[in-house]
Amino acid sequence: MTLDKNDAKLFYELWFPLLDYANKKYKVNTNLENITGAQKLEPSEVKIVADHVWEHISVIDEYLSDYDLPDEYRSIVLSWKKCISGQFVLERHLKKGSVFISADTQEVYMVNGIITSWEEMFFYRPLPILLKATLIPFRDKIISDGLVITCNVCFGKGYSSEFKDIYMNAKKNKSIHFSL
């Protein structure tokens, strides 16, 4: 499951200017000059700036006070302050999205891809997969900021079974997060 084409486009139209703002104001990564207009971006370089935004969430307020965005767009960007960064176990793929389990809290999230589904991105890897990611709201869905790192960890049957149980309990208790 992914965002529809228009929402995916809108995400990047909102996300890249925020990154540019943070990078220019705080000189986070001098290797990047113009994220919004770049033809090609190195994800590891962009991640440096994104991590700065997530670690200094007040940058979002500063950005919104300096730029006059339409209310709808302002609301979307403001919602990103509800981000959740950390390690997640990608446990399974479903029609509604992919199941992410927080390694810290064992909370279960249904996460959508932006342009490409998680299943397509990780078709070559057996599940479960340990990821470092930042989950953010986008309208009524959960997505990542698009800058995910895979951890080189293989889980045995015991852990895989435990992750399955966490998911099944969350499903039974209706405690899966579909939005933030």
Language model features with spans:
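OB-fold (S1/OB) nucleic-acid-binding surfaces
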Residues: E91-I114
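Structural detector for short beta-strands of small beta-barrel domains
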Residues: L78-K96
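OB-fold/S1-family RNA-binding modules
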Residues: A22-N29, E33, I166-S179
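A structured, charge-rich N-terminal accessory region that forms the first stable segment of a protein
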Residues: M1-D71
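Short linear interaction motifs
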Residues: D66-I84, Y109-I115
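Short nucleic-acid-contacting surface segments enriched for D/E, G, S/T with interspersed K/R
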Residues: I115-T134
